[in-house]
A protein has these predicted regions:
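Conserved interaction-surface patches within small, structured recognition/assembly domains
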Residues: 57-69, 75-83, 98
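Hydrophobic residues in beta-strands and at strand termini
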Residues: 20-21, 66, 116
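Active-site helix/loop of acyl-thioester processing domains in fatty-acid/polyketide metabolism
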Residues: 35-53
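HotDog/MaoC-like acyl-thioester-processing domains
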Residues: 3-4, 9-14, 72, 83-184
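Anion-recognition interface
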Residues: 29
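Active-site-flanking beta-strand signature of metal-NTP-handling nucleotidyl enzymes
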Residues: 15-19
Length: 184
């Protein structure tokens, strides 16, 4: 197997800008979170595919922070960068900003991290190029992603523990003082 040449994050950095139209609004008059999630998935795909040179799929969305609402008529720019690469996976950092075109006010509205996996022609995970860390920001993002991966693995073990079957006495103790009523 040939060795893949490392690519800098600048190679695959992607920005998508879209006007927020009335049909994107929720009942509160702001842009629906699902619209923003769909756009984030699009920029994550474009970024990961550009880095890997392959078709990519979303395998997880680690966090989506909704920091500020987005209004109808604003321009939203979604910026994606490869923060980490594994063998076939990549963690894509996404920053979303909105611009009020009337006031020229720019607001950071969302931050998110998508884990993408590159697929080969056989639809199986395929190796991606290493990431060339060229700046202190690149190094910081890569290290943060290592910690994010570690936390994610610990969280998965924690979730498994939560889902364990509990004995009835433990359940009674857990529910004591909670705002619930048991009807069975």
């Amino acid at each position: 197997m040939e060795k893949l040449e490392a690519r800098p994050s600048s190679f695959s950095r992607v920005t998508i800008t879209e006007l927020m139209i009335p049909s994107y609004a929720n009942f509160g008059g702001k842009i629906h979170g699902g619209i923003l999630l769909s756009l984030m998935d699009k920029v994550a795909y474009a970024t990961a595919s550009k880095h890997s040179g392959a078709y990519c799929v979303t395998v997880s969305v680690d966090t989506v922070d909704f920091l500020q609402p987005v209004g109808v008529g604003e321009l939203v720019s979604l910026m994606g960068s490869v923060n980490y690469v594994g063998n076939s996976s990549m963690i894509i950092g996404i920053k979303v900003i909105s611009e009020n075109v009337k006031t020229a006010t720019v607001t950071h509205t969302n931050t998110s991290y998508f884990t993408m996996v590159a697929k080969g022609d056989d639809d199986r995970p395929t190796t991606v190029p290493p990431l060339m860390l060229e700046t202190k920001t690149d190094i910081r993002r890569f290290v943060e992603a290592i910690y994010r991966k570690k936390f994610k693995m610990e969280h998965a073990a924690y979730q498994k523990e939560i889902k364990k079957n509990r004995d009835p006495e433990e359940i009674k103790r857990l529910l004591a003082g909670e705002r619930c009523e048991v009807g069975v």
